[in-house]
Amino acid sequence: MSWTPFVDSQFVAPSNGLIQKGLIMGRDGTVWGVSDGWAVTAQEAKNLAGQVANPSSVPASGITLGGVKYMGLVADEENFQGFSSSKKQGVSGVVLKSAVIIGLFGEPHKNPNAYSFLKGVADSLVNAGTLQ
């Protein structure tokens, strides 16, 4: 099953422009669904899975998704954020037991808003029993 339709219809579209692109991947680095136009490679997803398992590595190494390197701002067992000043965009992610939910946001929207929105999506999926 591809999660791409869910990504676009349930957290990109309803975010009213806050989340520009989305990605859901397994904790093993397997891409489940990604928005069209966000060319996240299998290797980038695998690298991110390693960073999720070792969040202290994010501030030093940054996060690379879709060919863009984001400076790692914060990372812990539950979330991470990164920002690219050259691209004027950032990434925010929510870490679950089985999956990672990631959103790409633009500079006008600061990462706490993106994280809060994505956390709401993640909580809904967990509460529905869809993900853990």
From Swiss-Prot:
- Protein name, UniProt field: Profilin
Quaternary structure note? Occurs in many kinds of cells as a complex with monomeric actin in a 1:1 ratio.
Keyword field? Actin-binding, Cytoplasm, Cytoskeleton
Entry GO terms, CC: cell cortex; cytoskeleton
Q: Could you tell me what this protein does?
A: Binds to actin and affects the structure of the cytoskeleton. At high concentrations, profilin prevents the polymerization of actin, whereas it enhances it at low concentrations. By binding to PIP2, it inhibits the formation of IP3 and DG.
Q: Which SMART domains match?
A: PROF
Under InterPro entries, the record lists:
PFN, PFN_euk, PFN_sf
**Recorded GO MF terms:** actin monomer binding
Fetch the Pfam families from UniProt: Profilin (PF00235)
Q: What is the lineage of its organism?
A: Eukaryota, Discoba, Heterolobosea, Tetramitia, Eutetramitia
Entry's family note: Belongs to the profilin family.
Location (main, coarse): cytoplasm
Subcellular location field: Cytoplasm, Cytoskeleton
